């Protein structure tokens, strides 16, 4: 338990000093981590853990929606909003149906988003 508290404090401290670009990357990584745990819960028929990790993943997508800047992002922001909303729907279905395939769909989309985000962020860093 003590290690968990120390890790959480460290993570919160890291989040406090990271750039907005790094924070988005961390959110995508969190989605992947929680989805993996939700899949384990589905396999183990652990309803409580499945619900917990689906809720955590959903909360991250909601946070991503809330951080979208529609003025600067234009069409991309609207596209991402729709995509994030669809991922939330898939998570809800995964939870209702106890369906690992729905979680896999979310994982595949999130991996693509993370890869694209890293590429864009790396290109911005090189350009500076």
UniProtKB/Swiss-Prot annotation:
One of its GO terms (cellular component) is cytosol. It is found in: Cytoplasm, Cytosol. Its main location: cytoplasm. Coiled coil: none annotated. Pfam families: FliS. Required for flagellar assembly and thus bacterial motility. This is Flagellar secretion chaperone FliS. It comes from Campylobacter jejuni subsp. jejuni serotype O:6 (strain 81116 / NCTC 11828).
